């Protein structure tokens, strides 16, 4: 179940390609992805979807997966989940 509110996004809502969903599920990262703010979820998908070459899509997907595993990065920038903020 996803109760993320996407209504406040200023950019169009991006569809999740099946290969992204499959990768998230295979690695057990779907919940980590859904735990990110709506803008991050949407930005990741937009960034991956904009890639022209399959190799670039795969590279971007891997970066997203690596950042979700770490939990403290978003697009190579520091990220502190709300549950860890003081």
Predicted feature descriptions by range:
Residues 1-86:
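Charge-dense, helix-prone N-terminal extensions
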């Amino acid at each position: 179940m996803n109760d993320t509110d996407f209504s406040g996004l200023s950019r169009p809502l991006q569809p999740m390609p099946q290969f992204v969903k499959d990768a998230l599920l295979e690695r057990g990262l779907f919940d980590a992805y859904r735990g990110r703010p709506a803008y991050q979820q949407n930005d990741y998908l937009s960034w991956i979807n904009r890639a022209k070459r399959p190799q670039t899509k795969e590279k971007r997907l891997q970066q997203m997966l690596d950042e979700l595993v770490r939990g403290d990065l978003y697009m190579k920038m520091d990220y502190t989940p709300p549950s860890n903020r003081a």
